[in-house]
A protein has these predicted regions:
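Alpha-helical residues within the helix-turn-helix
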Residues: 15, 26, 60
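A short, Lys/Arg-rich alpha-helix, primarily the initiator
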Residues: 1-23
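Short, charged recognition helix plus adjacent turn
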Residues: 60, 67-80
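Short coil turns linking two alpha-helices in DNA-binding domains
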Residues: 20, 31-34, 51, 65
């Protein structure tokens, strides 16, 4: 699993649940800008990864299981 795959999984997960990334963040109790592409790397270009707490909030808000979410990573494992 790489940085791109996990963020792409969040993008797809939001879309498949009928939301934008901003909508998913809000529904999860997060700042609406949490999943903005501009926040996926630091100002120095270092990748920022979503925390396990963030993933947990996504799952709770959508009533999804970890397997439901990680399927999106499995489905895009050839992406780099």
């Amino acid at each position: 699993m790489n940085h791109y795959q996990i963020w792409h999984a969040i993008d797809l997960f939001a879309h498949d649940h009928g939301m934008s990334c901003s909508g998913l963040a809000k529904r999860s109790g997060l700042d609406p800008t949490t999943f903005n592409k501009s926040k996926r790397a630091s100002v120095f270009g270092q990748p920022r990864w979503p925390s396990t707490e963030t993933i947990s909030k996504i799952l709770d808000a959508t009533h999804a299981s970890p397997q439901d979410f990680f399927k999106y990573i499995k489905d895009n494992e050839n992406l780099k």
